[in-house]
Amino acid sequence: MSEIFDAKAFLKTVTSQPGVYRMYDAGGTVIYVGKAKDLKKRLSSYFRSNLASRKTEALVAQIQHIDVTVTHTETEALLLEHNYIKLYQPRYNVLLRDDKSYPFIFLSGDTHPRLSMHRGAKHAKGEYFGPFPNGYAVRETLALLQKIFPIRQCENSVYRNRSRPCLQYQIGRCLGPCVAGLVSEEEYTQQVEYVRLFLSGKDDQVLTQLIARMEKASQDLAFEEAARIRDQIQAVRRVTEKQFVSNAGDDLDVIGVAFDAGMACVHVLFIRQGKVLGSRSYFPKVPGGTELGEVVETFVGQFYLQGSQMRTLPGEILLDFNLSDKTLLADSLSELAGRRIHVQTKPRGDRARYLKLARTNAATALITKLSQQSTITQRLTALAAVLKLPAIKRMECFDISHTMGEQTVASCVVFDANGPLRAEYRRYNIAGITPGDDYAAMNQVLRRRYGKAIEESKIPDVILIDGGKGQLAQAKAVFAELDVPWDKHRPLLLGVAKGADRKAGLETLFFEPEGEGFSLPPDSPALHVIQHIRDESHDHAIGGHRKKRAKVKNTSTLETIEGVGPKRRQMLLKYMGGLQGLRNASVEEIAKVPGISQGLAEKIFWSLKH
């Protein structure tokens, strides 16, 4: 590789999620592996003018390529970073210690057990959880546990000599067992058991027990206690939703696929003993017009059946694409491996979340690859040439979304010379039209958007109308009737009709509503920018429509009850532990809430029941 690494173009494609990055030199050798809570922020730091050290300068000078693997938590990134360092032994990494010196979380065997970090021999009485990749991972986990399960983390010397609780008790990070009377033995023991289960990966048992306690507290009308337990349940759920380590110690290969602009990315996550060991993105050569199913099927067959990967076959392969010959593939792999290999395409639970992670990484890698091949500037330049324009400095695109004509929303997205200008994206609620009339919806949104004064810098060079000839005719009619102070003839109106079976790459473009349109090659940078802005508009419209539909569906019945304002609504939900608790309450129980009369309680009761 002799080309200079384009850091600016690369950083535009990097996500702000946690993950791991690998840096390669001109020979394709991994020279550094790192992890980050925010990949974009961390990687940007390498390309500043004032670098922190000569080592970093020497490293950056040799970078020819960077791969990133997105993870869902920083802890997962730490584990993955460690596995990559062990695998590649990069010369710019400090090599970590071997497993025998790794830190553990220690739950002591004291009367009031404490949590702490432990290294070395395991002589002390208590339980050890780990090992963790480094001390930072342990400290991060301890801080998390302290927020959810407030058992003590202080040294025994401090614990034995306190006469009043410390600041940790005041801010809710410790139950204060050091001072008699602050917490019962039963409650402290219960929280210790939650910690034990949580660190053992038994999150479901923790949630089951907490939910049972919350329901009992609600039945006993101990609403403050129920609310505290509810907050604890929510905290546990927030954490467990982000954990992607299987309790079953599974051996899996998880294959996610992304396809865009004539290019495919197949991302494989390798999971052994329930832990993500690493991942890799593959970019198979895809002839024009190839179906995505064929891409996946061919790749999987070559990847596993050519022999080099056979000895690493897992017990299960997860795919995010439903293969027509799934059974044949599974039988062939099983025969080669001498044991049963399962191929799943619709997994649930942890497996579904692994698949989502693989899909996320595939999409991220593909975005980076496409960006490296053709930047947004190059694409806009190519489109300007196709449209015979001197330049395209601003481009706007419209789309309509509704369900059976209801909750119609129009979207407008804006691109400038640097790509998406999300601060200027707009949604328009469409009203006063015949349900399902997309032409009327397009007519309305264009009049609202352009039937007023517009700054010179915000007049678009191109207006893309998603929908083909009919929608383009509406746009032409609207612009013909506009009476505005700006040059309404400046924007070029361009219609785009989806191809047969709505396949990307087969779009037809129209300058006029009459006559034949024209198409661009699937690998055309001009077509890629059209697809990009159209997809952004489509997603923006659908997002707005879903929010509007959800608002109608989920508007609390309480908001429609006369006499129940925001303060009373908040009081009701607080005392009843949420809307479900209120629905289950009797008139007498509702009337006990401060500020709620017997008459209003009856009105609330019957409104919720009917």
UniProtKB/Swiss-Prot annotation:
SUPFAM superfamilies membership: C-terminal UvrC-binding domain of UvrB, GIY-YIG endonuclease, RuvA domain 2-like
GO cellular component: a single term: cytoplasm
CDD domains cross-referenced by the UniProt entry: GIY-YIG_UvrC_Cho
GO molecular function: DNA binding; excinuclease ABC activity
GO biological process entries: nucleotide-excision repair; SOS response
Keywords, sorted A to Z: Cytoplasm, DNA damage, DNA excision, DNA repair, Excision nuclease, SOS response
UniProt-recorded name of the protein: UvrABC system protein C
Organism: Salmonella paratyphi B (strain ATCC BAA-1250 / SPB7)
